[in-house]
Amino acid sequence: MTSVIYPGTFDPITNGHLDIIERSAVIFPRVLVAVANSPSKKTLFSLEERVELVRQSVAHLSNVEVFGFSDLLANVIKQHNISAIIRGVRTTTDFEYELQLAALNRLLTKGVESLFFPPAEKWAFVSSTIVREIYLHGGDVAELVPVPVFNALKAR
């Protein structure tokens, strides 16, 4: 079975992320969403909270699995027999960065390719960073995030 992985910090998962997951789930029989533990990043939600928010957000997708990881992505890819890495690219800046990561991951995994998904137009401006900034300044993020994330933010 072809399995792909969509790694990210997802702090929090946005509707842009969810759109990419849903589109991937239509194309591939198995999509793994790997939530990264990034000690160098100051996250709003803990790893456990982020994993649970992603799980709740993709509960309607039967071929999507969610887990947290702290290891090198290349090692996770080998452990799960992954065929390709899914990455979202909004801008040319994203593309340049992702191109470098794709080359590195291809080297470290002995050939696993990265597949770049442009965002749906309505989500092209959305990022976790923007969502956090709006939230921290008291703005309404209801249209930008899945319902479980909005509820978790309201409860904070």
UniProtKB/Swiss-Prot annotation:
User: Which EC number(s) are documented for this chain?
Assistant: 2.7.7.3
Coarse class of the protein's main subcellular location: cytoplasm
Q: Which domain of life is it from?
A: Bacteria
* Pathway listed: Cofactor biosynthesis; coenzyme A biosynthesis; CoA from (R)-pantothenate: step 4/5
GO CC annotations on file = cytoplasm
UniProt binding sites for substrate: T9, K41, L73, R87
Coiled-coil region(s) at which residues?
none
GO MF terms here are: ATP binding; pantetheine-phosphate adenylyltransferase activity
Compartment(s) of residence: Cytoplasm
Q: Does the keyword Ion transport apply?
A: no
Q: Where is this site: Transition state stabilizer?
A: H17
As its record notes, the protein acts as a catalyst of: (R)-4'-phosphopantetheine + ATP + H(+) = 3'-dephospho-CoA + diphosphate
Q: What does this protein do?
A: Reversibly transfers an adenylyl group from ATP to 4'-phosphopantetheine, yielding dephospho-CoA (dPCoA) and pyrophosphate.
Q: What is this protein called?
A: Phosphopantetheine adenylyltransferase
Organism of provenance: Haemophilus influenzae (strain PittGG)
Question: Highest lineage ranks of the organism?
Answer: Bacteria, Pseudomonadati, Pseudomonadota, Gammaproteobacteria, Pasteurellales
